[in-house]
Amino acid sequence: MVKQKEILTAQNKRNPKGKGFTTLLESVFRARIKKVQEELSAHKLDALFVFSDEYRPGYTLYFSDYFPVNVIEESPQGVFIPKEGEVTLFLGGINAKTAEGISWISDIRSVENLEDFFAAKNYQHGRKIRAGLDGEAIMPVKYSKRLEP
């Protein structure tokens, strides 16, 4: 029989930073990112941009462990996963502030800065990056236009 103390200890170790909507270990999310990065390399892509919104947050929740607070603002959201390196979480302004205490991702930015972010990535690579896009069907035109060349 498992002791109560052992159960509590296991629960506290789920997320070593004490963050997260799902209470899954940060290592679970890092493993998901690593798998995507391996696929990006295999398909010769520089990155994947995953888009969700406040009504269908599943894509970004899967990678970021953040569930948006949709009663305070519209919450377009995205996760930028580069072939190598750390991921970036994009949220609406109020949700971006809230996510700092919840998501395991440390680089959290306003979704309104997508265009500048991608321009900087293009500059760093010396060319337009080759990025996959997930969630395109639910992405508002104003955001998809910011990702156009």
Spans of model-derived segments:
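Non-catalytic accessory segments adjacent to catalytic cores
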Residues: N113-P149
